[in-house]
Design a protein with these regions (language model features):
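N- and C-terminal low-complexity/disordered segments
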Residues: 1-57, 184, 217
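Acidic, Ser/Thr-rich intrinsically disordered and amphipathic helical segments
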Residues: 13-20, 92, 115, 144, ...
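C-terminal catalytic/acceptor-binding lobe
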Residues: 16, 20, 40-46, 58-93, ...
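A short, compositionally biased domain-edge/stem linker segment
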Residues: 123-135
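Short, acidic, metal-binding catalytic loop of nucleotide-sugar glycosyltransferases
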Residues: 134-140, 152, 159-173
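A conserved acidic beta->alpha catalytic loop
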Residues: 139, 151-155, 180-186, 214-217
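Hydrophobic targeting segments
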Residues: 141-147, 163, 175-178, 196
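Conserved catalytic core of nucleotide-sugar-dependent glycosyltransferases
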Residues: 184, 188-192, 197-199, 208-212, ...
Length: 367
């Protein structure tokens, strides 16, 4: 007779529970460690933050440079404008508007694109392709939202349902660019971003670029989608990671750079076929160019993710070899070796850029 205890202990379900328990214990350990910092260390860190605030702050004035990101316990308080604050159409839009309340009511239920069109059809200020700009003030940033895409038709409407109202409350000028990969090659998220950048710049003199995964839903409208003096990592606390930063150099999900910054780092690498590694390479490029990375304070950077488990996409096994040569490749692989042929169509809420990507379109010379 089979020992029932042996069968139970070897069950994949039990193994999964054990792994989940160990991860939760590790996460709790991290939280305990962070909360055990001494008062002296906190005071010292606040002094250093204050000394560096002017040099490293972005236009949002509420973020912190990565090299000072040791704890969020002692962050400066962000003040938002009162409800009765008056601003004028010929003045720059404030960055901390009364309309930005903080937590967003997240609705992850599936919705068709037709329903999204109907939802925003009564807003005449949204132009073809999803272009919008405020009329009651001058937007501080002209923001191109670039979304890499393949077979996520149920995710895009959910994202737009949340992002459009949020960006309108933030009084940013914006438009959406959905960059869709077709063909048989593995998904190349980074190359799609490069294509989206090139196409977006043909439409308008954008000054801020947001690189946004379609399955990341922001939980706070105070996560201001403008750019700054440093590249910005917006999605710092993702629910599937228990709202913890997976590792210090994590730069995935949602990030933002000015056009000047993006050109200086030569964009994303084109050589990452399959998922994984391209965000780490972007981090390296940012550091190699002499930039730090800013992040939202507190819980402002919280996001919910739509589960998908990289359906149909393969993991890029060669990413570590490429990452070891990030610095050598940076000037050879990116915007400057990009070639593509795009098919452009317009939706009421976004511009669709369809490309069939192959490695031959971004060949790299020897380094």
């Amino acid at each position: 007779m089979t020992d029932s205890a042996t069968v139970f202990s070897s069950s994949p379900f039990v193994v999964h529970l054990v792994n989940t328990y160990l991860f939760m214990m590790q996460a709790q350990g991290i939280l305990i460690r962070d909360n055990m910092r001494t008062i002296g260390a906190q005071v010292y860190e606040q002094v250093v933050r204050s000394a560096y605030a002017k040099r490293n702050s972005s236009v949002n004035d509420s973020d912190y440079p990565l090299d000072l990101n040791h704890s969020e316990t002692f962050l400066q308080t962000t003040t938002f404008l009162p409800e009765d604050f008056t601003y004028f159409a010929n003045h720059a839009c404030p960055e901390r508007l009364p309309s930005m309340k903080g937590p967003i009511a997240i609705n992850m239920s599936e919705i068709g694109m037709d329903a999204i069109h109907e939802l925003f059809s009564e807003d005449p200020t949204i132009k073809l392709g999803g272009h919008w700009k405020p009329s009651d003030c001058i937007p501080r940033w002209k923001v191109a939202i670039l979304i890499p895409f393949r077979n996520r038709h149920e995710h895009l409407p959910v994202l737009l349902r949340h992002l459009i109202p949020m960006l309108q409350r933030q009084r940013l000028q914006f438009a959406f660019y959905v960059v869709e990969q077709v063909g048989t090659q593995p998904f190349n998220r980074a190359m799609l971003f490069n294509v989206g950048f090139q196409e977006a710049m043909k439409d308008l003199d954008w000054d801020c670029l947001i690189f946004h995964d379609v399955d990341h839903i922001p939980e706070s409208d105070r996560n201001y989608y403008g750019c700054g003096q440093m590249p910005r990592h917006f999605a710092t606390k993702l629910d599937k990671y228990m709202y913890l930063l997976p590792y210090t150099e994590f730069f995935g999900g949602v990030s933002g750079l000015t056009v000047e910054q993006f050109r200086k780092i030569n964009g994303f690498p084109n050589a990452f076929w399959g998922w994984g590694g391209e965000d780490d390479d972007l981090w390296n490029r940012v550091q190699n160019a002499g930039y730090s990375v800013s992040r939202p304070e507190g819980d402002t950077g919280k996001y919910k993710s739509i589960p998908h488990h990289h359906r149909g996409e393969v993991q890029f096994l060669g990413r570590y070899a490429l990452l070891r040569k990030s610095k050598e490749r940076q000037g050879l692989d990116g915007l400057n070796n990009l070639n593509y042929f795009a098919n452009i169509t317009y939706d009421a809420l976004y511009k669709n850029i369809t490309v069939n990507l192959t490695p031959e379109l971004a060949q790299v010379t020897e380094y």
